[in-house]
Amino acid sequence: MYSGSSDGESHDTSTQRKIPPASSMLWVRNLRRYIGSGAGLGSEALMELETKRILLEIFKEKQQKSQEAGTIPSFYKKKPEEGSISQRVQKLAKYRFLKKQSDLLLNADDLAAMWVCLRENCVIDDATGAEKMNYEDFCHIASVCTEQIGPKCRRFFSPSNFMKFEKDEAGRIAILPFYLYVMRTVSLTQARIDMSELDEDSDGFLHSDEMESYIGGLIPNLAQLRDMPPAFNQMYCRIASQKFFFFCDPHRRGRACIKKILLSNCLQELMELHQESEEEVTDTEQAENWFSLTSAQRICDMFLALDKDMSGSLCKQELKEYADGTLTEIFIERVFDEHVRRGKIVAGNSREMDFDSFLDFVLALENKDTPEGLTYLFRCLDLQGRGFLTTADIHSLFRDVHQKWIEGGNYELCIEDVRDEIWDMVKPSDPLKITLGDLLGCKQGGTVASMLIDVRGFWAHDNRENLLQEEEEPPEEESQ
């Protein structure tokens, strides 16, 4: 009995050993080959199979490239063709992403509610009267704001954000700087979303027409621009846009990086126009703000006054009348050589300066102390195009200033003394030449440039002590 059972088990075992594995069977191999080829499958199954194959090939190709390239980034990314599926998918993905980011932003009501929460849950500093909060208050306010506003405000109440602000002896921070930080973050994020929506090719850069569209969309929300005549809108957007490109597109490629725009002072200057009442802003401040309506109209009127023949562009003779004719002739010549676009010839005459080039010209003269303005002017001062100025260049440049100075009835000057004074002001690293880096490093580059191109600029430098006294006198008279 036991032996019979044992024989049966041994018989079954021997039978199992004789059965070949499924993978070695001919019909299994044929079936796998048949399925792998895709023959007999429906159209949907074939499409899915083909999609998997393509994705696998793309993955293997990228994996191989990344292994070969190591840490070297790719410098060129081919943009999808116009109207292609890739472009449509990219636009849809960008739209959904920007919509999601926009939904996460705090709106005006949310910001107002946050300010109320901050004020209701802070403590008053006995010494200064400032409203402050410690970390426990900070966490409590975070909970209250989350209940009233929602989870989208939670990211502003992180420990790292609390540590960013200056603390007093008790470890408290003022609520106003924190609230201003929240407002600025929301404002910049909203600006980035708006600019990204206008960025048609999604490369992180805006072209001039896209920048003008962005500014045009802001006009209804800027208190000081609401009364702008509709006919002036397009011209205003052009004038405002040019400042962004002057400072954010130094190589004049016709496109400005969105990140640079957001970090530039230009955007902050534009946002100053949010101030409701004009009483908060003096006439001087309005004139100094490039984006104010007063400034834009001034620049437009200036160009029209210079354009005697009403051709829409300026010749050298017309530009010489700028600033009451105080700019030197050699400087005007150099401006046309370096910054007026080639091929702009009117009625067989020499090149003429269009409105965009005129805006750059004005921006450079009004922002001489900035790296961008000084770079523009240095190209004009560099008579030989060598990247530096010699004593001979200084002599040639100042000779025209000297002539206008004498014609104005001023005392006689020694050009060599002025040249030596400029050298003392700049203190160049190489005693024989002045570079752009030297002018930027000495912090007086704008003054030096004014002395060499504008007789009024030299007069201001020569009378700087008297001008300082005049600025200090009015407060003394008022106090008396």
From Swiss-Prot:
Knockout or disruption consequences: Extreme phenotype with disrupted cell elongation and a highly compressed apical-basal axis due to disorganization of the interphase microtubule array and lack of the preprophase band before mitosis. Sterile flowers.
TM region(s), chain numbering: none
Expression tissues: Widely expressed.
PROSITE patterns attached to this UniProt entry: EF_HAND_1, EF_HAND_2
Cross-referenced SUPFAM superfamilies: EF-hand
Entry keywords, A to Z: Calcium, Cytoplasm, Cytoskeleton, Metal-binding, Repeat
Subcellular locations according to the entry: Cytoplasm; Cytoplasm, Cytoskeleton
InterPro entries: EF-hand-dom_pair, EF_Hand_1_Ca_BS, EF_hand_dom, PPP2R3C
Molecular-function GO term, any one: calcium ion binding
Keyword Metal-binding: yes
Domain EF-hand: 186-221, 294-329, 369-404
Superkingdom in the source lineage: Eukaryota
Entry keyword Cytoplasm: yes
Binding locations of Ca(2+): 307, 309, 311, 313, 318
GO biological process terms, semicolon-separated: cortical cytoskeleton organization; microtubule cytoskeleton organization; preprophase band assembly; regulation of dephosphorylation; unidimensional cell growth
GO cellular component term of the entry, any: cytoplasm
Function per UniProt: Probable regulatory subunit of type 2A protein phosphatase involved in the control of the dynamic organization of the cortical cytoskeleton. Plays an important role in the organization of interphase microtubule arrays in part through the regulation of nucleation geometry. Required for the reorganization of cortical arrays in response to light.
Subunit structure: Interacts with PP2AA1.
Full protein name: Probable serine/threonine-protein phosphatase 2A regulatory subunit B'' subunit TON2
Provenance organism: Arabidopsis thaliana (Mouse-ear cress)
Lineage, top ranks: Eukaryota, Viridiplantae, Streptophyta, Embryophyta, Tracheophyta
Originating gene: TON2
